[in-house]
């Protein structure tokens, strides 16, 4: 029987694809380091809104330099202004509730629950844009709910904080809304520029929250370690994560990049266990794997 010869893949093409997967993995790992800086700053008695202010202020400065280095302009239209303000609002809500949840539950579990947002994107698209819900979407949602049930009791056997769970849910649904808006509102500008303006408007909303409902104006850091962790949060899980993601999408596309996003909560869980002594049991591992599996299925099926 004659066999169809396998296509020969040039070595350079294989190396190029490998770089794309490496960039996607690095993007996810970088984003998963959020708890590392946040929890160290919490230990120095800084509030979530203060930590986020320094994270995004640093990121905005770094992205400003990146845009200048690329020779891009900062001009935006009135329509783009309105969309970017909305992006900034949901970005602020998602970030604030996510960081606040670290006060009520292990950061690794919070990061895993945040990763439910791809499922929520599918539900939002079905409800508001009449996108058909396929069988694999229903299966993914059911599997993720089993995973959440397994996570209901933390590693020490104590039920998860209701406040913490609601904060993470608010964070994931806010991020899902942000993703749906970004998908439906086609802005004629690059990802770096969109993120720069979203972060700038996010800073405005964070300051409004701080002075009205939060801890007041962000205090000036007084320790070198505080500045170091603040800079780390602005650079690693924000700017580097974005740059690596953009490079990955250009090389291998959005679907493989989204699938490798599963490394985000894996990184956060690893940091929680190794650095902060968070407890990880067999039941929690099973719950985490079910949630990651369900969201990876969603990412793999969505085109």
Pin down the residues of each PLM region:
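C-terminal transmembrane-helix exit sites in multi-pass transporters
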Residues: 62, 67, 98, 117-142, ...
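C-terminal-most transmembrane helix of multi-pass membrane proteins
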Residues: 2-3, 52, 56, 153, ...
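Glycine-/small-residue-enriched transmembrane alpha-helix faces in small-molecule transporters
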Residues: 2-50, 54, 89, 93, ...
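Helix-helix packing/entry segments at the starts of transmembrane helices
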Residues: 28, 54, 110-116, 181-204, ...
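Membrane-interface interhelical linkers
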Residues: 1-29, 60-86, 127-138, 156-163, ...
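Hydrophobic transmembrane alpha-helices of multi-pass small-molecule transport proteins
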Residues: 63, 85, 133-153, 172, ...
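Membrane-interface helix termini and inter-helical loops of multi-pass transporters
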Residues: 36-48, 103, 152-161, 211-230, ...
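Specific transmembrane alpha-helical segments of multi-pass solute transporters/efflux pumps
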Residues: 30, 35, 67-108, 113-114, ...
């Amino acid at each position: 029987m004659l066999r169809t010869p396998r296509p020969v893949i040039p070595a350079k093409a294989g190396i190029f694809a490998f770089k794309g997967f490496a960039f996607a993995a690095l993007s996810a790992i970088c984003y998963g380091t959020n708890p590392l800086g946040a929890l160290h700053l919490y230990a120095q008695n800084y509030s979530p809104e203060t930590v986020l202010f320094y994270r995004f202020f640093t990121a905005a400065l770094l992205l400003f330099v990146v845009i200048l280095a690329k020779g891009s302009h900062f001009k935006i239209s009135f329509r783009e202004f309105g969309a970017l303000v909305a992006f900034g609002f949901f970005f602020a809500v998602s970030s604030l509730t996510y960081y606040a949840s670290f006060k009520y539950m292990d950061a690794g579990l919070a990061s895993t629950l945040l990763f439910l947002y791809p499922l929520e994107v599918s539900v939002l698209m079905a409800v508001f844009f009449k996108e058909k819900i396929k069988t694999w979407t229903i299966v993914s949602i059911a599997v993720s709910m089993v995973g959440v049930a397994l996570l209901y009791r933390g590693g020490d056997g104590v039920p998860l904080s209701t406040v913490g769970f609601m904060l993470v849910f608010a964070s994931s649904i806010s991020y899902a809304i942000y993703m749906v808006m970004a998908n439906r509102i086609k802005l004629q500008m690059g990802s770096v520029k969109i993120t720069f303006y979203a972060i700038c408007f996010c800073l405005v909303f964070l300051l409004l929250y701080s002075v009205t409902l939060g801890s007041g104006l962000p205090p000036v850091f007084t320790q070198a370690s505080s500045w170091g962790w603040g800079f780390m949060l602005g650079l690693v899980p924000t700017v580097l994560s974005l740059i690596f993601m953009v490079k990955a999408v250009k090389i291998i596309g959005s679907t493989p990049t989204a699938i490798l996003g599963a490394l985000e909560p894996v990184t956060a869980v690893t940091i929680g266990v190794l650095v902060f002594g968070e407890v990880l049991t067999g039941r929690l591992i099973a719950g985490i794997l079910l949630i990651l599996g369900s969201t990876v299925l969603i990412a793999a099926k969505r085109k």
